[in-house]
UniProtKB/Swiss-Prot annotation:
Top-level taxon in the UniProt lineage: Bacteria
Role according to the record: Involved in the biosynthetic pathway of pyrrolizwilline, a pyrrolizidine alkaloid. Catalyzes the reduction of 3-amino-tetrahydro-pyrrolizinone to 3-amino-tetrahydro-pyrrolizinol.
Protein name: 3-amino-tetrahydro-pyrrolizinone reductase
Record keywords, A-Z: Oxidoreductase
Upper lineage: Bacteria, Pseudomonadati, Pseudomonadota, Gammaproteobacteria, Enterobacterales
Alphabetized PANTHER family for the sequence: 3BETA-HYDROXYSTEROID DEHYDROGENASE DHS-16, SHORT-CHAIN DEHYDROGENASE/REDUCTASE FAMILY 9C
Active-site residues from the entry: 146
Protein family: Belongs to the short-chain dehydrogenases/reductases (SDR) family.
Enzyme Commission designation: 1.1.-.-
Amino acid sequence: MTRKSILVTGASSGLGYAAVQKLAENGFYVFAAVREIRGMFSNIKNIKELKLDLANEQSIEELFIYIEATQKDYPLWGLVNNAGICVPSPLELLREFDLRQQLDTNVIGQLLVTQFALPFIRKSKGRIINITSGLGSIAVPYLGAYSIAQFAKMAFTDVLRRELKHSGVTVSVVQPGAIYTPIWDKFLVTGQEILDNSLDEKRKIYERSFIEFLKASQIGVNSVKTTRNDFAKVILDIFKAEIPETHYYVGDDAKNFSNKSKILTVTEIDEWFDLQSPTESEFKKI
């Protein structure tokens, strides 16, 4: 007996882990793609943990060689492009490595995964879900590289959906709001490291407002009521829907963020973030 399979990237923790568990509990066979195999799903029969480095095309190809060998029993019907990393930094202090890593993981690698997956999903007339964030609606100071990646992923989703309109494959985007996941654990430490490795004159400009932003972000994410399970339920709903919608939000904050991007003028959005940015006197320190 065959069983529909779904590939979930970024499955080792956080939102991806929750989605894998939810899908498996509801009868799907799940390929859980992780950077390092740790046997976290070894006791669950319908989850297969597979190694995947999104910055390495050979790693992506090897994953799909394995998936291709399973198609008789577990035809690939779904893809959840969930993997993502976020390195906070003022754009002036942003390291090239951090920018490239975020683009490789959040955009380029996921496009490559989609390219490899499409022949299988087109055959099964399946579904693709791209996970972005509220930062795909409004670009946020000190999360510039991540915002760039999320805007790119929104465009990637729109183009893919339009190109596949008559293929039988559906494409949806999910924008979660603030949800605590391990991605936040290194937020303040990473930000401080970037400041410590910056030239003194540049650090003086951004240090106060950047540290305040990092601390406020951690406090904010620890106070939200939206959970990983809420996210996982949305993913399951998309795969169970007769006809999935093109756009989903997880959490009121995500929907509100998107609405503000449509209602507020650019000037109003700039003013909204004004208190988060360096002051005129801080720029005069150099």
